Each structure stands twice: as structure tokens, then as C-alpha cells.
Amino acid sequence: MVRKEPAFSFGVRPILNLFIFIFFFSTALMDANETRTATSRRLEEARQLRLSGKFVESLKVLENEVSQKPGRKNSSELAEGWLNIALNYWNLGEVSRAENAFIFVQALADEKNDQAIKNYARTSLEIIRLYQEAKRKRREKSYQEAEAIFLSGINLARKNGMKEMELKCLRQLNLLYWEIGEMEKFASCSESLLSIARLLNNRHEEVRSLDSIGAYYSKKNNLSLSFLYFNRAIALAEKENLLEMVPGSLTNMADVCYRLGLYSLAVYYLEKALKIYEKQDDLDSTISVLYALALSIYRQKENNPAYFAREQPEALLTTALELSRQVRNETLEARILNNLGYISINDNLDGSEQYLNLSLAKGLKLKDKEVISSALNNLATINLKRKKVQQAIRLYEQALQTAREINNCEEVWEDYAGLADCYEQLGNFSQAFKNYQQALATFEKIRDNINFDFYKIGFDRGKRKVYEGLIRVLVRIKDSQGDPKVDEQLFNTINQLQARVFLEEMDTLKRGRTPNASSNELAEMEGVINDFFNHDENLGEEDSFGELLELEHRYLQLWITEVAEGNKKERKEMSPQPSLLNLQENFLTDGQAILDYLLGQNESYCFLFSRTEFQVFHLPPEKEIEKAVKLYIKLLADPVSEEEDLKKVGAELGRWLLPSQLVLSDFVTSLTIIPDGILNYLPFETLRLSFQESGDRQVYLIEKFPVSYGLSLASLYRSTQEAGWTDYKKEFLGFGNPLCRQKEKDQMLARLYFADNRSLSLRPRLSELPYSQQEIKRIAALFPAEAGDLFYQKKATENQFKALDLTQYRIIHLACHGLVSEQFPLRSSLILASRKGSSEDGFLTVREIYQLRLRTELIVLSACESSRGLVERIEGVIGLPRIFLLIGSRSVISSLWAVNDLATQELMLEFYRGLLAGKAKHEALRLAKLKMIDSSKSHPYYWAAFVLMGEPGRIY
């Protein structure tokens, strides 16, 4: 109010006072308007914070605003302020506070007679009442009533356009559907939640909704989609600084990684989750993470004995067990006891049995079928190890029945595999085969939904015992029966399982499935990864390996998503596989033999295929072969190793690995090797033949046969069924001695460190390769003028290689440094030059090569250790040769170890001379090696490293 002024007579003074009155009156009005304007701004700021999901920040603004003297606010502003407070409390899950705030809003609206706000508050209070009643019914397990009441609240919110009220009711309904196993309703509800969360910019709920959709696909055993949604949830949570609010996304992602065989990535996510739960003093969740972490570390060490873990599985589980007993959580205790029993089976049967019996007893008490089925399976395994086969069968069957009841596919296939092992020990091979087939069929349902080869390889990693078991029992049946039908069945099984991921991906690429390499998101993620390598502080950091793993897999997810978008209508049809008769009549030539190897825990096999024969030879167990091969490779790769040592070990391996009738045969003229496991790193050409009559000198295998290598029978067969190209515009493309800038040399340290844990003290040197430059020049000179293109030093850039139409070249020769990573196989790379200011870093990685297309007759990787990579049993080596074969090259020559570049030049020149003279690829390589054997460079170090993979025939 304006204070009443006293009366004044006219004159100068009254006029002056009038102006003063007008001035102060106007100022008061301006102050009031400014106050209202400032209040409106703050209310709008709070509203925008709320709409962006920043509820706590919004509350701080509002509480400061409404705490000022009531006289400075009008009722409408107060009502609006308290309405925002109520909605913030609602969104934060503080329902009682939200209810009280809505009651106050209703009172303020009554005072102002603001019908709109009054109706909003009244409707909100009714929704809260329904929400609380539905939650009570859910706690009482009156699920139908709870669902109906939640739906009433949701419909009321929808009718009035109250999205925030609808969102929270939907969230609770979603939890109800999960609890009662209504998975399709759960999925639909999760999609609705995601849509509303995005509409409201509620990032917290968006993360939770993505996590829910991931959980749905995980439950449905669609591991690719569950990985995708969990990955999106975590990425968004990190971006919005919400990860501490949703650590469950990390544990969910870890579970999917575990099921995909990505154990080290699972460890990384679990360790991140553990830090959050410990900080929050969430003991139950901490215990859950501890036992999951222990199991992930155990499986990773089982897969890679050299794996370094900060904590040992048994110590983690013991800690988790003590904590579970302290908080009296019997459900967690039962699971931990089971896991303790599981990791003790190989070392302490009695101790393992004690843990498992305790776990089973608690599982039965709690009626926890997951614990019961797992404990029964582990107890069955103990009985099998003790040769109590009938008891083991009984326990496996009980475990199988329980696992089926809860649709636990992982447990079901393990039970079938256990039963197969039992029947195999009883000599009932047909029954064993049936159970192995059941195990295979069970996890194939999960595998069929995995949409990327690298993830399929990880998934297959834990299923080797089934793959090996199928082949092993068929070998037993073949040995005992000699039935041609069994031969066909064994052949088909080998064909089905060997390098199957390679064949599946080859079919996919033929259908045109390629990612959009220009995607902004992909380019951004590539930049993040490259930036990671540019920071020296990442070297030696204990979490750096996990961080790089996470970045790599995020890149893959973006890539896979783009592929899926471009191929939604794609049909998944596999190319037909050859029959044994077809292989022998239409593929194998007179004089050609194939040796196909399978390494096994108890015994290994060599399968000999020729036009007239299919024989099986029994070999020593994998560990014996592996020990001898590692020693031999060490001798081969050392140019000063003793000749006698080479002869001794080479002859022993020759006796083990080469069938005597093959070596003695005068009818075999060429040999193809399909290696398994460590044999992928063995140059069979160097094996000594000791079957000659006394007095004959001991010769290398290469002196008798030309040798080539293949990934599988099916892949070799398929390469011959496709017509070769004839319309090449150029004969030869050569890249040699790329000149690396200092930036690339600096990055090399980081890349080597993450590639193979190489010591930081062993600083890498990217030395120039002057002979490689001479190599490609001299090779190119063998071809007609204008028949080839050469790029070397500064011109041998990654940009240049990618810019070329590679399909126009018959032969591509890359003489450069190579970087092979067994820990990050998709980051293995060829090191080319890079231009200043270019977006390309000079490291041509496997996943970049995947985006290229070839139709070359031959790729020559004249680079250090370019044959190496991640060795996967049955699948082969995941590395550079494989990817070049996959994208369209008919064959690849690569090296098994670092070779002197002058010796490499000599070998390559001789090889190309033979090739251009019309020799088959494997024969040209053989002649080049024989020439070196007869020279001063006769040591295998100089000539044995280079091997031919793929189609071995003539080019000219």
C-alpha cells in the first residue's frame, strides 16, 4: 500500500512533493513487477530443471523461493512453486512428501480460486492414493488387484495429460510384471516408459527404461539386444552423471558379458559397480557383486591362465560368504556356497562337496530352483570324477528337470553335456551323442540371436566340451563300427563346427551387410579411442585395460546397430555344406591330401582326407602337443638355435602329427593343413620326416610336398566353388616402408602395451624397412610396365590405401610393420603412414579392414608376425589373414614371426618369379623356400615363417 501523505498548500513545495510521490509510487510498482519477474524467472528455471530430470537441483531453487516471506508472494506463484515441489518429490520417489505438497497446493488454489491448479492437485492426490493402494496389494501378492489399480491410476493420468504421474505408476506396474513373469507386458510397459521418459527429458527414467528393455532381452536369451540396451543405459548414465543412481545397469551388463564369454569385460563392469555399492553402504548388492566378480575372474583365468587379477576368486567368495552370514541373507549365502563348490571341483573334491551339500540344503529350504539345479549339476560332476557314473546320471537328470522348470537354458545344456559325458564313460556312445546333440540344440537357440562374429566366438568359447564331445564319440563309433554312414555323420559334424563363425560372417558379407563408416557417432567414438592412446597416463593405470575394452565394445555396438538398420529384411540363409562324397569327387584332386586337426583334453585327432580315403589318427592330448610345439617354435624363430635341437624336436613332432602312410605315400603330391589351437602357429613345412630307410638323410616336409593352410574344409570347398575374377585392371598393388611420423611412433607404445601387456621399459622402435621398399620395387619390375601401382614412404598412407578401388588389383602386397593384439584382436593393425592433419592415424585395424571389399587372388602381408592373433579352439586365429579372407581375398601369405627384411626380400622375389612362371601359389612358395634351404640362409628362421592360407592354385 502507498502511505497517505499529509495535505500541502499549492506552491513550489507541493509540486515538488507531487513529483516525489509519483517517483516513489512508480518505483514501488517497478520493484513489485521486478520481484514478480524474478520470481517467475526462478519458477521457470525450477520447472526446466524438473523437466530435464534434475529434480534435486530444481528443489533447491524452489525451496529457496518459497522460504521467503509469504507477503512477498501471491497465491498463484506460491501454488505454482509448491506444485513443482510436489512433482519433484513425486519424481524422486518421496511419495509422502509429494502428497503433503499437493495438499498444500490444493489449499493455495482454493484461496486464489485457481480451478486449473486445484483440479491438477486433486487428480494428483487421487493418483497417489491409487498408487499407494496398488503397491500395498503388490506387497500382499494380490497381483491381479494391484495391476488393475495401477492401470486405473495410469488411465487417470493419461486422461488428464499428466505424464509425470503416469511415468511413476508405469514404473511400479513394470516391476510387478517382472515379479510375476509377465514378460511381454513387461516389455510393452518398458517401451512406454522409455517413450515418456524421453518426452519429459527424464534421463534417470530413460536409463532405467533402457535397462529394463535390456533385462527383457536377457530373459529372452537375446544376448545381442540385451548387450545393446544395457550399453546404451550405461553410456547415457555416464553422460548425465547418473551412474551412481543406476549401478544395477553395470551388473546387468556384466551378466550379459559373462554369458557371451567376455569375462574380462564382465570383471571391469563388476569392479565399477562394486565401488559404487561400497560407497553407498549397500551391503546386499556388494555381496552379490563379489560372488559374480569371483566367478568372472575364475572363468577368465580358466580361459587364459596368464590373466592377472587383483583378487583371487576363492578370497572374494570367502569374504562374500562371511558378509552374507552377517546380514543373514540366506538366498545370497546359498549362491555363494554353490560357487565356492564350483571353483573347488578341480582341486578339492571333498571340500567342494561340503559346500555344495550346504548350498543344496539351503536351496531346498528356500525353494530356490536356480540354486537347486546348479548345486545338483555340480554334485553330479563330483560323482562323475569319482567314477560313480550311475549316481552322476541320477543327479544330472534331477538338475535337468529343475532347470527346465525355470527355463534356465545355460543350466539345461550343461546338464545334457554332463549326461553325455556319463554315457561316454559307460561306452554307450550313441546315447552320449544324443545328449551332446541336445546340449548343442539348447544353446543354439541362444546363439542364433547373436548378430556379430566376435560375440559368437566368445559365446562358443565356453561350449568347446560339447563340440569336442560330439566329434569324440563319433570317432569312437567309427573306430568300432566302420560304417560309411558314421563317416558321413562325423564329416558333417566337423564341417558344421569348424570355423563356423567365419562361414556365417562370410555369408552375411555376401548379402551386402556393411556398416556406414561415415557415421558421425562411429567417427566420434573412433576419435575417443585414438585420444585414449594419446594420453600417457593411461599406461600402467590399473583400470585402463577395462576402459579400452569398454570403448571398443561401444564402438562395436554402434557398428552393429548401423548394420542392423541397413539389413532389417535380411534373411539368414547359410550356404549349403558339401557332403563327404562331394568333397572327395568334386573338390579334392588326385594327389591332394588334407590333414584336419582337433586338439582335445584327453586325446587329439588328425583327420586325413583324400579322394579315396577318410581316416582318423589318434594323437597325444593337447597339453603334450602344446608343450612340444612351443619349444619348437622358440627354436625356429631363433636364427642361432642348434641344428641338432631343431632336428630332434622337429622329428618328434613329425612322428606325432604326420600319419606314416601319408609320408610314405608316393601318390600324395600336395598337402593342406587345417590346424587347431597352438598348431596355428606351427609351420608344418619344417617338420622332419624320419620314416626313410636307414642311411637316408632327414628331410623337411616342405622338401616332399607343397604345403598350404585352411580355416576349415567348408571354407576351402567354398572358395573353389566361386568363379575367380578375370577382369582385373591392374596386376599388382604394393605398399612398402611407410614413413611413420613421431605421433605414430608415440602411439605405438600405448598400442603395444595394450596389445600384449608389453613392458613399458621395452620402448618400441618403428625402424624403417629399407629392404621392403626395394622388395616391392623389384617385385613390381617382374610385371609388365603400367601393370601395377606402388606407394612407399610418405605416400604409403592409410588414406591412400582406403581411397583406392582395391577390387581392380589381382595381387596386393603390403610390406610394413604389423601390430598383433591377442587381448584386443579387432585392434590388430598394419602400420601405414599418415598425413599431417589427416583424420586417419596410420593404424589400419582389423575392424577398418572389415569395411573394405576385395576380390584379389592373393594378399601378401610381408609384415612382422602378421599370422598371429587370438587363437580360438576350433574357430582358428582371429587376426589379419582371417579378415582379408573374409572380405574377399582367395588366399593370404603372412608371417608367423619377425623375419629379417633382407631375407624376406629374397624369399618374396623367388616366390613371385615362380608365380609368374605359372606355378601354383603353394608350389611357388615351396620352391622359394627350397632355394633358401640350399643357401647360406638354410635355418628355418629365414624361410619358414611365411605360410599360405586359403586357395593354393595357380594365378597365371
Predicted regions and their residues:
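Catalytic cores of nucleophile-dependent amide-cleaving enzymes
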Residues: L716, R810-E910
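Conserved alpha-helical positions within TPR/SEL1-like repeat arrays
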Residues: L43-L51, E80-N91, N119-R139, M165-E179, ...
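Eukaryotic all-alpha helical interaction scaffolds
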Residues: R50, L62, K69-P70, Y89, ...
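Amphipathic alpha-helical protein-protein interaction segments
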Residues: S430-K704, S715-A750, L760, A781
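Functional beta-strand-loop-alpha-helix junction segments that form "active/interaction loops"
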Residues: E573, Q577-N582, E643-L653, R763-R827, ...
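A domain-level signal for caspase-like cysteine endopeptidase catalytic cores
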Residues: F230, L270, L631, L658, ...
